[in-house]
Design a protein with these regions (language model features):
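Compositionally biased, intrinsically disordered low-complexity segments enriched in Pro/Arg/Gln/His
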Residues: 3-5, 22, 28, 50
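Residue-identity detector for glycine
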Residues: 8-10, 14-15, 63-64, 74, ...
């Protein structure tokens, strides 16, 4: 098993390498000469009590006394310290790190203000020294049931093979889930919250939602929870869950939604009345790390109702069942005489768990209750749902009286008065028998618990203050911070050994070639990493093209993790040997847009410092794998060899008149405007990568020329010389369309005015005059190629015509086409909504597109909210709503065009308004429209919440923001998955960028402007 965050080397003491605080005790031959190295290592940890405990134990062994060692570490700590808001001196990185002046030695991508914060120092310690600050994090899924990984059915019906009702009793095979949960980065040890209000039929251990067949618009979580705060090392995290005091209406939600048609609204939890009179609890969960292996958990329960109410609060600790096959040692959770739990694991080591005074520890096993589910015999007398049976059903025999197991919960029964709050606390600490037991005994829930918690809150404030433009309103700053918190909470441990899974299904293609099963051709895959999820309930699996967009907001807070995500998708245990990037677990072989080269460029340019060796290594390694992916596209998705690409749905689900992933009802093939434009953009991105690499290795100039040629051949094919009826550009309409090429060789354009026709706008790159001067040989070869292939350039932007500041442009659209496409896009009766660019023109509301095949009528009409069909599961819709990823690429393209045309190009925005804007102003206008979805408007309402009054007016709801999957095409209300902070989290970058950037910045910024930091120093600028 591979881990995403590996622990780097520590100092060498007496010939040994110390990799963790807990290992200090094991070294007996440390020499006095290495005392300074040891002391510097100690400064990586947080509290002086730890420092003294360590010094007391080790000093005699290194030939020094305790006072000398404490004095030395204290002196180094003083030199390395930074002061928090309350004036407390905190341990930071070592003296060596704190006094570095070369930006190349810092954390990749950190701004100088971020670098000065306590959280910035922790990031540096993690990335440079390997201090395991990221080892524990919010890596627990919010839904493991109903996933492909857990599906062992004969028919591939994942939703019904492993249900929510079974989840409390049935052991998972590949992961775990929970409420407000954390785990280590290999998910051996998990911590989460369970609740019971005394009325629910089951213990609330996981979020409830409808399966795909139960919801009138597909799967849908039916809970209210919010990712309020998080830092990139997860030193501070905050999560809020709204728990009704009445019995949770499980049956009502299922039965009512099943009765509703696809044209009706969904029946939501708030519609059931369980929040009437504010009869609910706000359950706030906070985590803070005193050091990487000392984690504090505080659960504060606020009774918002008019009467006192009872609630059972059960912080729960358990091990993922890795011992099911009998080949792995079973870990243990065992109560000691002081009422704490000692957690022992053969890989993770020993930990101690301490809970609030008065808690009763309940123990059981993370084993399936076969008797309940299947009428069989249980392997152990105590099973996974034993704590549920004890709390809800009062069965004292359901938990182990011996105080031992693999799952344990600290049971607190609270009576919370109306309008008041009560708190439960837990502490999880790594144990070293000789050193840390004494520390745990004195510190576990001591006075410093609240000090640590408050300190980490303040440090989180400082970190986000360093990211936030000073000019932002408080509301904008809050939305930006919540978006980034959502990105960080959406990390998940994703475990899937496809080779083993196929063997277990007796469907491995090399061993059982006759059985058909999804993902049979992906048996090379071995996933066991921390990955950014689109939504940890609705989409608790990675989606390749989503992940590329996740890199935009993630790079703002954790550039190293961002690069890790790109490297994962391009690694040999993800990327198919043929070069295809895996799509998602329902079908790894589906085809998503090729945006990973763009994401690689973004991650590179987002690093505000001089690019050093590690950056070039990152680019070089990514480029090699992206070259494989590009070749796969050229060989597999250009069937005619005419540089006109297909690819299927390409992430846009139901946008076409036909299911673009299925065989066409007409026969023939579909030449896709978006697929072809994606490849034009891919070529441009690979060209830019090759040029960057050619600065250190001239051999990449040949590859740069290759991608120049690819771009012009692809772009030229989209609009060939002369007016022909089978090309994608429609001169009469001034728009791009898919072309249906029939078996008899005839062709017709599918005149749907959709996002498909806007994606060619995004295929634009600007080349600086410095690049032309730096590579004279390449420039001459490109010029020679263009002179020999003049026909390719007739309908494209002239690549040899200098623009502002001598820039050259590579674009599918020349100036005339750009104006015509923008006129449509900026028309409020067509694409431009108050909250961004729609995925389908509103003109199709009154004029749906109809295509008839024999007697069957296919139709595409404007649907601003949910889909009215079951295509692609029925829970997404690209026929009208606003989606962030394409809007982001449009904004990026407008900024590129502005860099070339400057202020000389203006256009009416909105179309027909008489108001002329530069392309920078258009980009900012689009960004403002997108951002406005989440901000309070002049009426004090947030468009994202539509007409839901409680979310708009209630002081305990109105400032909590959900980042939905997509948004109503007319009013901006959130639709689809409610926590798809993933690509919707890109709003954070839009808020930050346009909160401080100027047109002059856009004209002169090196690299990609979307990744630009306007106020970084010259030495810190991307090149």
């Amino acid at each position: 098993m591979r881990s995403t965050h590996t622990l780097g080397p520590g100092p060498h003491l007496g010939g040994h390498e110390i990799n963790s605080y807990r290992e200090i005790n094991s070294y007996r031959d440390v020499r006095p000469a290495n005392l300074v190295a040891f002391a510097r290592y100690v400064t990586k940890f947080t509290f002086c009590s730890r420092e003294r405990q360590c010094a007391t134990h080790v000093a005699p062994q290194v030939g020094g006394d305790t006072h000398a060692l404490v004095a030395l570490t204290g002196r180094l700590r003083k030199n390395a310290s930074y002061t928090s808001a309350n004036g407390s001196g905190l341990s930071g990185p070592s003296e060596v790190l704190r006094h570095r002046t070369n930006r190349r030695d810092g954390v990749v991508g950190m701004t100088e203000d971020m670098d000065r914060t306590a959280e910035g120092a922790r990031l540096r310690d993690a990335d440079v020294l390997g201090v395991p600050w990221r080892r524990f994090g919010p890596y627990l899924s919010e839904r493991q049931w109903g996933t492909v990984r857990e599906d062992y059915s004969q028919n591939g019906d994942a939703w019904n093979y492993f249900t929510h009702d079974q989840a409390r009793s049935r052991t998972y095979r590949w992961g775990e889930d929970g409420i407000a949960g954390i785990s280590d980065d290999r998910q051996f040890l998990c911590v989460a919250l369970a609740l019971w209000n005394g009325k629910d039929p089951i213990l609330k251990e996981r979020m409830f939602g409808l399966t795909n067949s139960e919801g009138n618009h597909g799967e849908d979580v039916k809970e209210y929870y919010f990712y309020v705060d998080n830092t990139p090392t997860h030193s501070y995290m905050r999560y809020l869950y709204k728990y009704p005091q009445a019995a949770y209406p499980y049956d009502d939600l299922v039965s009512t939604n099943r009765k509703r048609s696809k044209t009706e609204f969904e029946y939501e939890l708030i519609n059931t009345g369980v929040f009437d009179e504010d009869r609910y609890f706000d359950v706030e969960v906070e985590y803070a790390k005193a050091d990487p292996e000392d984690i504090l958990m505080a659960v504060t329960v606020h009774n918002r109702g008019p009467e006192a109410a009872e609630i059972h609060v059960l912080p729960t600790v358990w091990y993922r069942n890795t011992w099911w096959d009998g080949l792995t040692e079973r870990p243990t959770l065992e109560s000691d005489q002081s009422g704490r739990i000692l957690a022992k694991h053969h890989v993770l080591g020993d930990w101690v768990v301490t809970a609030s005074e008065g808690a009763t520890w309940l123990f059981t096993e993370n084993e399936t209750n076969a008797a309940r589910l299947f009428g069989g015999n249980n392997l152990t007398p105590f099973v996974k749902d034993g704590i549920h049976d004890f709390v809800v059903d009062g069965r004292s025999d359901a938990v182990n009286p011996a105080g031992i197991g693999t799952k344990a919960a600290a049971h607190h029964t609270l009576i919370v008065p109306a309008g008041q709050s009560q708190r439960v606390i837990v502490r999880l600490q790594r144990v070293d028998v000789a050193v840390d037991v004494a520390v745990a005994a004195t510190e576990s829930l001591g006075a410093n618990f609240d000090d640590v918690l408050e300190l980490r809150r303040q440090e989180a404030d400082q970190f986000y203050a360093a990211l936030t433009p000073a000019e932002l309103s408080a509301d904008s700053a809050s939305v930006m911070r919540q978006a980034l918190a959502g990105m960080l909470w959406s990390k998940q441990f994703y475990h899937f050994d496809v080779d083993l899974w196929l063997q277990e299904h007796q469907a491995h293609p090399l061993r059982a070639p006759t059985r058909d099963l999804r993902n049979r051709q992906w048996f090379h895959m071995l996933n066991g990493d921390i990955i950014s999820m689109p939504d940890k309930w609705e989409y608790p699996w990675y989606a390749a093209w989503d992940l590329a967009f996740h890199c935009v907001p993630l790079s703002m807070v954790d550039p190293a993790f961002t690069r890790n995500q790109i490297e994962l998708m391009l690694s040999d245990v993800y990327l198919h040997p043929n070069g295809q990037i895996p799509a998602y677990e329902w079908n790894f072989g589906d085809v998503n847009p090729p945006v990973h080269a763009w994401a690689t460029l973004f991650a590179y340019h987002a690093a505000p410092h001089e690019h050093g060796g590690s950056d070039i290594d990152f680019l070089r390694n990514a480029f090699k794998k992206l070259l494989l992916n590009f070749t796969w596209w050229v060989n597999r998705k250009d069937p005619s060899g005419r540089n006109l690409f297909e690819g299927g749905f390409l992430g846009l689900d139901n946008i076409g008149v036909f299911d673009r992933s299925a065989p066409l009802p007409t026969g023939g093939q579909l030449e896709q405007a978006d697929g072809t434009a994606w490849m034009a953009l891919f070529s441009q991105n690979m060209l830019e990568l090759a040029i960057e690499l050619a600065t250190v290795d001239p051999s990449y100039e040949d590859l740069a020329l290759k991608f120049v040629q690819h771009f012009f051949q692809i772009a030229g094919a989209m609009d060939r010389v002369g007016e022909t009826p089978d090309e994608m550009w429609d001169e009469e309409d001034g728009f791009f369309y898919d072309v249906l090429r029939l078996p008899d060789g005839t062709a017709t354009r599918l005149r749907i005015r959709s996002m498909v026709g806007l994606i060619p706008l995004c295929a634009v790159a600007v080349i600086s005059p410095e690049t032309l001067e730096q590579f004279p040989s390449l420039t001459a070869r490109v010029r020679s190629y263009l002179e020999r292939n003049r026909d390719l350039l007739v309908n494209l932007a002239d690549p040899q015509r200098p623009g502002v500041n001598g820039h050259r442009i590579l674009s599918v659209l020349n100036e005339e086409k750009l104006r015509r496409v923008l006129n449509r896009m900026l028309d409020e009766e067509r694409f431009l909504s108050p909250h961004g660019v729609r995925s389908l023109s509103r003109s199709h509301l009154d004029e749906p597109y109809v295509f008839t095949v024999e007697d069957h009528r296919y139709e595409v009409g404007y649907l601003p909210a949910e889909s009215d069909t079951g295509m692609f599961g029925g829970n997404s819709n690209w026929r009208g709503p606003v989606w962030f990823p394409i809007n982001l690429l449009i904004i990026r393209a407008l900024l590129q065009y502005y860099k070339y045309y400057g202020d000389s190009f203006t256009i009416e925005c909105p179309t027909g308004s008489g108001h002329e804007m530069t392309l920078f102003e258009v980009a900012k206008d689009l960004a403002d429209r997108l951002i406005s979805i989440f901000l309070r408007n002049e009426d004090g309402d947030r468009p994202v919440y539509g007409g839901t009054e409680k979310f708009q007016q209630d002081p305990h709801w109105r400032d909590l923001v959900s980042f939905h999957e997509y948004f109503h095409g007319d009013n901006g209300a959130g639709v689809g998955a409610s926590h798809q902070t993933g690509w919707t989290g890109t709003v954070a970058r839009l808020i930050q960028l346009f909160g401080e950037a100027t047109p002059d910045d856009a004209l002169h910024a090196p690299g990609g402007f979307l990744a630009y930091h306007p106020h970084q120093s010259a030495a810190a600028s991307p090149t």
